[in-house]
Swiss-Prot record:
NADP(+) binds at residues 48, 54. This is Chorismate synthase. This reaction introduces a second double bond into the aromatic ring system. Pfam families: Chorismate_synt. Its cofactor is FMNH2. It catalyses: 5-O-(1-carboxyvinyl)-3-phosphoshikimate = chorismate + phosphate. Reduced FMN (FMNH(2)). Gene3D superfamilies: Chorismate synthase AroC (3.60.150.10). Keywords: Amino-acid biosynthesis, Aromatic amino acid biosynthesis, FAD, Flavoprotein, FMN, Lyase, NADP. HAMAP family: Chorismate_synth (MF_00300). Pathway: Metabolic intermediate biosynthesis; chorismate biosynthesis; chorismate from D-erythrose 4-phosphate and phosphoenolpyruvate: step 7/7. It comes from the Bacteria.
Amino acid sequence: MGANTFGKLLAVTTFGESHGPAIGCVIDGCPPGLELAAEEFAHDLQRRATGRSRHTSARREADEVEILSGVYEGLTTGTPIALLIRNTDQRSKDYATIARQFRPGHADYTYWQKYGIRDPRGGGRSSARETTMRVAAAVVAKKWLQQRYGVTVRGFLSQLGEIRPEGFAWDAIEDNPFFWPHAAQVPALEAYMDALRKSGDSVGARVDVVAEGVPPGWGEPIYGKLDGELAAALMGINAVKGVEIGAGFGSAVQKGTEHRDLMTPLGFLSNHAGGIIGGIATGQPIIVSIALKPTSSLRLPGETVDVDGCAVQVITKGRHDPCVGIRAPPIAEAMVALVLMDQALRHRAQCGDVGEMSPCIPEGVGLRNADD
């Protein structure tokens, strides 16, 4: 298999390249009876889209979803849902000079070694353009999770370079192009990115995602762990080089008396586990974080080799994000939502007759960040 499909009971397959005629996905396993219309995809797709601000790629795509199958008279039918988005703003000529060169830090070299051929236009299949369809598929998952279980999945930029939020408000996140939780810092972020763009360099970032309302019991032990599948899904996002669940790598310096999440009849007293213990949800907010590397497409010259093995200097033209993390929150939300829906369907299939167990400990403190 080509590993273009993920999920078990909810299986999502994506297809298409950055500069091809279209990108698309097939969602197999969505229960019937969910109301779904093409216009419902617009909000999240615009949140992910390039061209939202001067701090992202200038490529502007309409990202209009065509529902090809799986929906009849506004309701899902239980059959595969096929979605298609036409590419309309490709500029393939920008990549003519690097068609035979390997851009450092990109998948050019590894795709060439694996397949013996590659599509150099905008990165082809390895482009973040592919994540558009993950976000589209997650529109279905988010709606089903919210209606069926009251689950919400929200993400935000929690670090830009060395800059961290100095405050937090969910309401601030959707009111600025950075998905930043502290509105007072946005002007400083604007100035930082303006200077970075003028320098021709790029920078990394961190994104946090919080899923609230997840019932205790979702997930599986050992090989189907909820945190394991979340980590795999998030690592499948372009440019992600690290994933944390809850306290994550901070756990290495904690004592057991600090890290353990004490329980009372009124709820948990902390959430260092990030809402998952033993691969199974505790009922607390699920907290995951990803680290994204700096964009490797730079207009600054760098050393590389071409397909003949000769040393060359590469300068990448085209339209690129100076920080891919700025558009990553909707993508990270999407992967979390798709994993949660798949796990919910699997839990219902195996354990639907178990019922609600007692005691069911309230989520308690419901910490936003595991470190708070």
